[in-house]
Amino acid sequence: MIIWRTNQSLSDGLYSEMLESIESNHENKKEFFTTFYDKNNLDVFNNLVPFYGKIISKMMTDLGLEHISRYQYTVWMQMSNSSTTSHKPHAHFTGLESISWVHFANVPDQKCFYFKDSNSNKTYPDQNTGDFIAWPSWAIHGVDEVKQNNFDRIICAGNIVLQEYNFNNLKLLSDLN
C-alpha cells in the first residue's frame, strides 16, 4: 500500500514547538488531539509547512510528478496516548486527494497505524520515529489505542491534491485552480 517512504527526524526545536502547541491546545484529554479542523491559529505551522514541503517535493520528484504537475498539500498534527481515544478507520479521499502521508514524529514500539482491507484485515507497516510514509488517499487506515503508559504518540499527516497534471499532451485541471 505504501508508495513512498523515507526517514527524517524533526529538529529538537521544531519537535519542542509541536509539544508546546499540543499541550496548550489539547482540551479534551479523553479524546485524541488533532489540528485537522483548526490549524489556522497555530504558529507551529509556520515552521512545519516548509519542513514538509521539502520532503513532499523530494517524494513528488521520486514519483515522477514534480515536473509534470502543480499540487497543494495540507498538514495537521495529532497526538494520542493510553488515556485518549484512538483514530477509527477512515480514508482521506473525497475525489480530490491523490496521495496521503504521515510522519511519525514520536511513536512507541507498538505498531499503532494500520491499513484495513475489504475483509477487515489489518496490515501494520513499519513505523519508527522519523518514518514518513505515503499511500493512495483512498486506502482505509486507522490507529490502534496506545498501550504504553505515559507515552504521547505524535504524528503529522496530510494530503496532496494535484491541481494540474501535464503529460503527453494530456492536461488535467482540478477545480482548485
Segments and roles (model prediction):
Residues 1-2, 175-177:
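Fe(II)/2-oxoglutarate
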Residues 45-48, 94, 149:
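Aromatic-acidic/polar surface patches that form glycan- and anion
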Residues 1-70, 86:
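Non-heme Fe(II)/2-oxoglutarate
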Residues 71-144, 151-155, 159, 165-173:
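Catalytic core of non-heme Fe(II) oxygenases with the double-stranded beta-helix
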